[in-house]
């Protein structure tokens, strides 16, 4: 994957782009109608990145940039201390480090008592995903805070001509995540992204679209399941219409309203090949656990 275009931006100031919507006064304080959406973890996420917020590598090409922001509670005002923030992105050639022990351009940090976090790294670049389409430059973030659903998201940058052609970046829900870039006097850049955590996240429309389709049982090619989107939710097709599944975080959907002791969970994994693997775990009424693995080819 090759670098296609460097981001050029002449913004005069950094703007804090928050992942929440309208603020309203409840008679005592301002509270937020927190509009937060999440993505499914893509093929380039690696757990266990080291605790480090300086990801820049000496001698490597790239434009230096600082990403900073504030993590807040559900009320959109109270800082959240010790939220875990994981950042990962490609290098200046559009390549991700998916296996080396160095965890290049990958790091973890924690918010302080004021909810503040920051990373110093390089500006990622657009890259060819392999089929001729170009993904706009972006940061990947995963934010984990006790009491809330983990937030997985992607941050884009104003001025990137590839945004309008990308189904994820061009989504109306992504507008708050297209960040203005401040050019600092020392020649580096800065972007700001604030987040308010919520208990239940809405999955991006484009993400639901990616998960829909027919999945074939890996152990028995004669069996398959089909998923479709309705009212921006994921449904499994049946002989009448379908069964709706709720997103519960960490790439997992669950069928709601199951009796105690019973469950049906869907875990999606987007593979580097572009294929999507689905693991279905369920417990039936006789307390027997079942696991079936399916695959949807690209």
Write out the residue ranges for each language-model feature.
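N-terminal secretory signal peptides and thylakoid transit peptides that target proteins
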Residues: 1-15
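Bacterial Sec-dependent signal peptides at the C-terminal "C-region" and cleavage site
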Residues: 19-29
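Beta-strand-dominated extracellular/periplasmic modules and repeats
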Residues: 27-167
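Extracellular beta-sheet/turn segments enriched in Thr/Pro/Gly and aliphatic residues
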Residues: 53-58, 163-202
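Beta-strand secondary-structure signal
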Residues: 66-68, 118, 140, 192-194, ...
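Well-ordered beta-strand positions in beta-sheet-rich domains
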Residues: 82-84, 106-108, 116-118, 152-154, ...
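Short proline/glycine-enriched turn/loop segments at secondary-structure junctions
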Residues: 130-131, 180-187, 267-269
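Peripheral terminal and inter-domain segments
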Residues: 196-298
């Amino acid at each position: 994957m090759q670098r296609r275009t460097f981001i050029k931006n002449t913004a005069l100031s950094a703007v804090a782009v928050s992942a929440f919507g309208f603020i309203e006064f409840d008679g005592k304080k301002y509270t937020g109608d927190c509009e937060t959406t999440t993505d499914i973890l893509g093929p380039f996420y690696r757990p266990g990145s080291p605790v480090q917020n300086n990801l820049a590598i000496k001698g490597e090409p790239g434009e230096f940039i600082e990403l900073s922001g504030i993590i807040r509670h559900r009320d959109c005002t109270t800082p959240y201390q010790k939220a875990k923030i994981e950042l990962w992105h490609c290098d200046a050639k559009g390549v991700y480090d998916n296996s080396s022990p160095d965890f290049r351009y990958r790091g973890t940090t924690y918010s302080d008592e004021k909810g503040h976090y920051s990373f110093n790294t390089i500006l990622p670049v657009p890259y060819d995903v392999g089929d001729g389409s170009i993904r706009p430059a972006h940061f990947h973030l995963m934010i984990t805070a006790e009491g809330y659903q983990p937030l997985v998201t992607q941050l884009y940058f104003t001025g990137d001509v590839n945004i309008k052609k990308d189904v994820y970046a061009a989504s109306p829900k992504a507008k708050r995540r297209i960040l203005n870039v401040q050019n600092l006097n020392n020649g580096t850049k800065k972007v700001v992204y604030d987040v308010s955590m919520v208990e239940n996240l809405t999955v991006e429309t484009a993400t639901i679209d990616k998960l829909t389709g027919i999945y074939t049982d890996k152990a028995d090619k004669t069996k398959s399941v089909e998923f479709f989107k309705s009212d921006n939710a994921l449904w499994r097709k049946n002989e009448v219409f379908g069964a709706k599944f709720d997103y519960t975080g960490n790439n997992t959907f669950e069928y709601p309203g199951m009796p105690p002791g019973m469950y049906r969970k869907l875990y999606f994994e987007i593979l580097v090949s572009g294929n999507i693997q689905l693991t279905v775990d369920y417990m039936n009424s006789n307390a027997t656990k079942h696991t079936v693995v399916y695959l949807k080819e690209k």
